[in-house]
């Protein structure tokens, strides 16, 4: 048997490994939070878009939620707008929100829709304002002062989700479209707010009762030591994850991801996956192989 034939048989075996997963997840909803390096690097953008389109073609229903990456900071610099901070926390004033909306709902959302379309997907760009998908309210951040007093800080147009209206998303999903959502919400008065994309992804996954929430980031998953890949947790339960937040092993940008995972699991999502978008076809490797490549979190 020649090498070409052996390679072809190996390819067939890889496809067969995916079959039980395709059968299991057929017709189910996956909410994918697209962020980090995968949004910047051209190759990684293509891998992610191809993976999302493939999911749709094998009968899975992906919903993409994206953040701003470094694009917002770049746009602010170009426009000569300096970030404002109160007690170390960034404030989103009217002018900043205009820039955030322009970058999120304009440039980034449009780029993702174009990539998905390039590979044969029917993608529709939305913001949380579209069809009032995300009802939001102002978020007041509680912090401790140097004197140990707890105070509430007004961060301007920074909000949190009150409710997710899934009607428009469900119409699009049921008609073969891939919704691509930017994390801007409206309050009851029609005022817009900038929301954390990880949190919005968890909120949408919970509201849609998605099978999976998948968070694409720049690290392999949840690790005890960020510099040591061998400390990666392949599988965690919700209570183990809570413990890691409480004892400080999860910190920085991983905190909103972990909190989003817990919220989603509490609201009916079966499993949450945190994966590294720098790995070629990370989405497919996580979903369609037995061992996966990132961290999978499930209910207790």
UniProtKB/Swiss-Prot annotation:
Keyword Transport carried by entry: no
Site, as annotated: Transition state stabilizer: 33, 257
Pathway annotation: Amino-acid biosynthesis; L-arginine biosynthesis; N(2)-acetyl-L-ornithine from L-glutamate: step 2/4
Record-linked CDD domains: AAK_NAGK-C
EC number: 2.7.2.8
The protein's enzyme class: transferase
Methyltransferase recorded as keyword: no
Molecular function in Gene Ontology: acetylglutamate kinase activity; ATP binding
Main location: cytoplasm
Gene Ontology CC, one term: cytoplasm
Record's subcellular location: Cytoplasm
Signal peptide: none
UniProt similarity note: Belongs to the acetylglutamate kinase family. ArgB subfamily.
Name of this chain's protein: Acetylglutamate kinase
Annotated source species: Methanocaldococcus jannaschii (strain ATCC 43067 / DSM 2661 / JAL-1 / JCM 10045 / NBRC 100440) (Methanococcus jannaschii)
């Amino acid at each position: 048997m020649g090498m070409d034939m052996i390679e072809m048989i190996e390819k067939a075996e890889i496809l067969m490994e995916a079959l039980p997963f395709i059968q299991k997840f057929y017709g189910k909803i996956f909410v994918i939070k697209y962020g980090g390096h995968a949004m910047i690097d051209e190759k990684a953008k293509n891998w992610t878009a191809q993976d999302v389109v493939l999911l749709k073609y094998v009968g899975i229903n992906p919903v993409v939620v994206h953040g701003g990456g470094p694009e917002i900071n770049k746009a602010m610099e170009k426009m000569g707008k300096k970030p404002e901070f109160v007690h170390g926390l960034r404030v989103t004033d009217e002018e900043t929100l205009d820039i955030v909306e322009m970058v999120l709902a304009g440039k980034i959302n449009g780029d993702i829709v174009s990539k998905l379309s390039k590979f044969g997907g029917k993608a529709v760009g939305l913001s949380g304002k579209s069809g009032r998908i995300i009802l939001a309210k102002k978020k007041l951040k509680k912090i401790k002062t140097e004197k140990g007093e707890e105070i509430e800080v007004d961060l301007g147009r920074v909000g949190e989700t009150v409710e997710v209206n899934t009607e428009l998303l469900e119409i699009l999903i049921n008609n073969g479209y891939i919704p691509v959502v930017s994390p801007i919400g409206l309050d009851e008065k029609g005022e817009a707010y900038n929301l954390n994309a990880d949190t919005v992804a968890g909120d949408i996954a919970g509201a849609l009762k998605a099978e999976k929430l998948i968070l694409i980031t720049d690290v392999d998953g949840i690790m005890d030591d960020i510099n040591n890949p061998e400390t990666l947790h392949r599988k965690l339960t919700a209570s183990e994850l809570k413990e890691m937040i409480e004892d400080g092993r999860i910190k920085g940008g991983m905190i909103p991801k972990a909190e989003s995972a817990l919220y989603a699991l509490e609201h009916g999502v079966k499993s949450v996956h945190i994966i590294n978008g720098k790995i070629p076809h990370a989405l497919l490797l996580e979903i369609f192989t037995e061992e996966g490549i990132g961290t999978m979190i499930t209910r207790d």
